Amino acid sequence: MSKKLIIYTDGGSRGNPGPAASGVVIKNKNGETIEEFGEFLEDQTNNFAEYTAIIHALKKAKQMNADEIELYTDSKLVAQQLNRDWRVKDESIQSLFVQAWNLTHEFDKVEISHVKREDNQEADAVVNKILDKHT
């Protein structure tokens, strides 16, 4: 039997670059939150923070023995890059892209979708809570 997780990720930077944080909310297939975490990232860009959130989310999902992932991000850039619709031109995030891309192949199925910011409020709240604590 497959284990499906629904994941919302967000990354934010106050200043871009500036104090940054990543946020992750993991839900079971019924939409119940089962994990919520984030990380303060010092001086980074939004894109760095977005990719960091996705990498941490996928690593956690692997630890939770998931084999199917629905991942939602409010970063159109990151979603399009991971879906191979857009190239990664920024050298500073190429290694993060590769790391995230490789992690997606450790699951039977991964769907990455762009959502509007208002549909990603829980992950955004994790980011803002961390940034408020550190800035």
Task: Give names to the regions the model predicted.
Residues 12-16, 55-127, 131-134:
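RNase H catalytic domain
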Residues 2-48, 59-63, 67:
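RNase H-like nuclease fold core
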